[in-house]
Structures are given as structure tokens and as C-alpha cells.
Amino acid sequence: MTNTPRTGAALFFDVLNDLGVEYLFGHTGGAVIPLHVELNKRMRRKQKVPRFILCRQEGGAGHAAEGYARASGRVGVALATSGPGATNLATPIADAHKDSVPTVFITGQVPSFAIGSDAFQEVDTVGMTRPISKHNFLVKDVADLEWVLREAFALAGSGRPGPVVVDICKDAQLASVGRQNPPRQRHREPIPFDAARADAILAALATAERPVIKAGGGIIHAGAAAALCRFVEQFDTPVTTTFNGLGAVPFALRHNLGMPGMHGSIPANYALRDADLVLSLGGRFDDRVAVKGFATGKRIAHVDIDPSEIDKTVRTDLALVATLDAFFEHAHASARRAQHPDWMAQIAEWRTQMPMPYPSSDYIKPQAVIEILSELTDGTATLVTGVGQHQMWAAQYYRFARPRQWISSGGLGTMGFGLPAAIGAWFANPEQPVVLIDGDGSFQMNIQELATVVANRIPLKMFVLNNSFLGMVRQWEDMMDGGHHYETCLARNDECEPDCIDIDQTCRRQLPNLMGLSQVYPRLTTMRVKDPAGLADTLRQAMATAGPVLVDVWIDKAENVLPMVPPGHGLAQMIES
């Protein structure tokens, strides 16, 4: 850093360069014009700057930053203007908060002297984002800009990761500053490791008859997947990976039970049902996994970096607040080992139903789509999804091989997440094939980001599982309301009856023609497949085609996601067919 007078905008990019920021996903606007002017100036001079990726809506930019962070483990950054730019970022911020994604969201703000005057495009960004962010800052004085930016990135990526919001007044971007205030990073004491508590957990795991490890997204965030696999072998204990933990252990590992919970695998849910000890590592006990009666008849142990998660929803018998690195290092250094031959024999029997078999049909089975893509990519592609039935099928039937290849909105369940997140994931690793699995409902919520795909020549392979329904809600309507469908049919128009009960395959003609998108977005190749007989060849052709490809896959409208633990029920009431 130099002490030459410069503007806040210049300082902004000096700090981002120093922090190693590669990409800014965003959209421009009046309150961030000084930043874009400085960016353009540096680009003309061929100076080092983060590459700016112009997304077509700020929400898309926010999800792209999430996708980048989830795929790389580095902090993702989004930039937007004040007012509607900031409010459009609210959903990605909340999404990143729910799933503990290391992100920094930078917004412009009206000049400091105009705050509180109801100025044009003024919103209280700090107040709005306080409950949905890890921390937030309002920069009114350029002298605070550097330390705030450095603190924001440190907070986003440390401890339990999460989104940090930095709201920068326009006059702070324009103001000149000579010697900047010295960076002020808050003193952070390392978490003291309680060896006695760790030993108690290891002893319980070694002496349990039917132990199960529940590995969460914290394993991915900590880069502890390899350590987890060694730990699983050391204690010969089956492991279930939560939705956000998928990829932490390879599918082929004999201890792997798959995903637990409402739409979890049969072996995962059976094992959790019958376990006498559940050890949660880096994951919370959310309502989709810790269903009714979850803790009955078993001991619960919990290791997490966030003390607020201990005893939050499930009573724990043994708890340890620690980094996973410290816990695994302690475990590997210990002399403890365990064998559970009878329990593992039962696990092996249950694993024959993972993933769950499904019957053939005259219509394309979505499960088959995922299995074929898994085979075509050797289970190594970065797999991104939207939210809905397609998301669950992808989680169930793709054979994950590594961490950070599964990118999906878990805690918030944000429809429209998939396409922009896939963009960010590709920028995180352009050499890695990125496959997007989406539904026709979720895909249309951020369809404008196809313009970002073609403008940047991003070779995404996009597969829309098209059932012309908001399928997950339709499934609940069929199971819980006698098949009465209320505004879940995407083919619905003003000629339809108020209560649509019949599922008519011919209604698809009233839907948008996804094949026509190749006429709207140059460089985009579109394909369609309706017949199971042509499915494998179409998917193979799509994966082999250069550039971005969109495949419209017509699936059975009535297909449900199974297994399913109905709301308010326990694992013993899991519906399998």
C-alpha cells in the first residue's frame, strides 16, 4: 500500500487486490458508479483488478458469488447498487447465512449526508440484513474503508463461515484519503480444546453397539473430508452425510449411508432409527433430519465450531465446541480403535437399497436421468441444482466422489438458485465440468442469467427436468390434500377449472418452449428428449457438445420423490413406495 492520496474507490480495489479477490459478480447502478469508473480506468491501463462478471439481476449475482464460494472454498463477492440492488441481494444473503457460505456482499449507499432523508434509492441496508448476515458494516467515512473491508473478509471466512455485508456511502467512494486509518482487526482467541470432552465422545463411540456418524456441511467448510474418512475407518462406524455434507465421503465407501432425513436414503434413515449413539460432526439438527422421536432411545454427541448449535433443537449427552481439525487430530493421535462387525453387516444389507430402486415407465424417469449423468461424468462433475423434486433426485442418485462438487440451496431452499450458482461454480474451476439439474419452475426464476452464460461463453450443461408442475408442492397436495392442485400446474391458464385434479400430459403445449431459447440466446444449443429410449443418447450428445447446452427433459408428471418421512412423523413411518 502507498500513502499517495487516492479516492475511496481506488482504495477499494487496492484492498481487494491485496486480498486476492478474483471475481466480482454484480450489476451496476448509481450508488456504485465511482467503483465502476475506477474499475474501468484500471482495465484500460491494464492494471490488476478482479474480473467483473455482469449478471442480469443482483439476485443472480449474489447466487453466483455463493456458487463460487461453495465450489472453491474461497470468499465469494457480489457488488450491487443501493435500494433495489441491495434488496435484490437479500435472498442470496439469507441463503448464504442458512448454509454458512463465506461471502461478502458489497452495496452502494446514498451519500452519508442524505441518510435518513428518504433519498432516491435509499434503504436501510444494514438494518435489513442484520438478521440474515453474520455481520454488517456501514461505511460513511473513507478513513474506515480499508479496515472494514479487511475485517469483512476475515469474518466471512473464519469460524463458522457466513455472509458479511459492507454498505459504502457514495461520498466515501469519491472522497480522497491520504494516510488511511490503520487496519483494525478484532482480537480473536483460539477456541480452547477440551481433551476430556473429546475423549468422552471417543469412548462412547468405541463402546456403542450401533453408532452412526452424522457428517454435516461443516466437514466441507473445514476441508476435513479426508480426515473424516480416516476417522470412519478408525472407529468402523457408518456415516450419513447431510444434504450440505454430500461429497464428504465417496459413494463407494462401505460405511457410507447416503443422505438422511425427509427424503433421505433407506440405509441412512434405518441406521439413525436403530442407532444407540449418533455423533454429529459439523452439522446442525434441522427439522428435516431430526424428525419426531429422533433422539428417543439413543445417546447424542455433538461436535461443532458454533456453540449456539449445541442443544438448540436436540438434547445432547456429550458436546464439544471445537474445530473439526482439532477433534480429528486428537482422535487420530489416540490409541482408540473400534470394530462393529454385526452392525456393519446390517449396514451392508441396507446399502443394497442405496439408491432406492425404481420401476420402469413409459415416461422418462428422473432418477434415470441422474444415474446416466453420474455414469457419463464418472461421478466427478460439479453438480448444481435448483430447488424442488429435481434437487432431491439429484441428491439421491448422483454418486458423489469428492467434497465441493455438490452445490445446492439447503437451509433456505431458494428456487432460482441453480443457474446463477452454476455460473459462479464454473468460474471457481473452469477446467471442471459443471452440470446443472433444474426444474422447469425453478429454472424460470432466474432464466435471465442465460445471457450471462452466453456472454461469457460458459460451457454449462443444463438439464431441465420438465414436469410442468411445481412438483414438490404437487406431491404434498397429492399425499395430504387428495390430489387437489392449487396454482401448482405451470400450464394453468384462464380456461382451466379452479381445482385441477387430472394430470394431463397434453397440457405441456401451453408452456414456454425451452427449445426456442437457442433463438433468443446466441451460442446456446438446445435439445429435447421425451422418450426413455432416446434418453441416454441425448444426454451423451449434450455432454459432448461444445459450449452451453440446455436439454429439455420431459419426465413423468406424477413421479414422486421417495422415500419420504411425512411432516410430523418419525423415521419409522418412512414411506418407501
PLM features: residue spans?
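A short, charged, Gly/Pro-tolerant segment at domain boundaries
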Residues: 165-174, 347-352, 556-560, 567
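Flexible, glycine/charged-enriched surface loops at secondary-structure junctions
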Residues: 161-164, 337-350, 550
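A general structural motif
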Residues: 5, 57, 117-119, 188-202, ...
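Thiamine diphosphate
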Residues: 106, 114-121, 310-313, 319-321, ...
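Short glycine/proline- and acidic residue-enriched helix-loop micro-motifs
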Residues: 133-135, 184, 348-362, 497-501
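Short beta-strand segments
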Residues: 167, 384-386, 552
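Active-site diphosphate/adenylate-binding microenvironment
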Residues: 12, 17-19, 30, 34-39, ...
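N-terminal alpha/beta PP-like core and its mobile active-site loop of ThDP/TPP-dependent enzymes
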Residues: 1-336, 372, 376-379, 459-462, ...
